[in-house]
């Protein structure tokens, strides 16, 4: 709360979608239902196969067992027939998120507007220090003044960059000096990567197999 609307978030390692959907749920619960209309989440990953699963938004009960019954009913549809034992995110939750393929080691991400927060958790541990520094330098113009960078518990960027200062155990804030040195990006956002058609077909075919939870 306290950030001017509309709120924008980048989940830079979306995997199969649990994190971006959790962020969307948190925004709705923190800001109210209006967040579903104004907030936006960019969810990216290098792997288009996991992105296809994320875009489908279908999970087993075991994958969502940590959610309360109230959250399950509010944000998910219950599978029936061949989809029994599964849940699917509701369309209004899915509409908050844009899924795209992106490689964090690319020189230019093609993202034009900065975010209120970037989630990059448990990814940097696979990069050496020079690569970590390069990725963090690309994050600088993509974080709004006072914006946050969320890292994993095993990641520490204190000795990698001076642009972000540690604010909490795994939370970094863009420093004032870095924010004042920001330059507008003119690159256009790339078109969303095409997802594997079999996954899209299966998701479309299962659309009618989900309904409100009883």
Where are these regions (language model features)?
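A short N-terminal interaction module
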Residues: 1-2, 7, 116-117
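Conserved class I S-adenosyl-L-methionine
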Residues: 4-23, 39-42
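Extended basic-aromatic, gly/pro-enriched interface segments that bind polyanionic ligands
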Residues: 12, 33-119, 123-131, 157
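Short, well-ordered amphipathic alpha-helices
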Residues: 20-31, 55
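A short glycine-rich, Lys/Arg-flanked "PGG" loop and its adjoining helix->strand segment in the class I
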Residues: 133-145
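Conserved beta-strand signature within the Rossmann-like core of class I S-adenosyl-L-methionine
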Residues: 145-153
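Short hydrophobic/aromatic beta-strand or adjacent loop that forms the aromatic wall/cage
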Residues: 167-171
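Intrinsically disordered or compositionally simple regulatory linkers and C-terminal tails
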Residues: 173-213
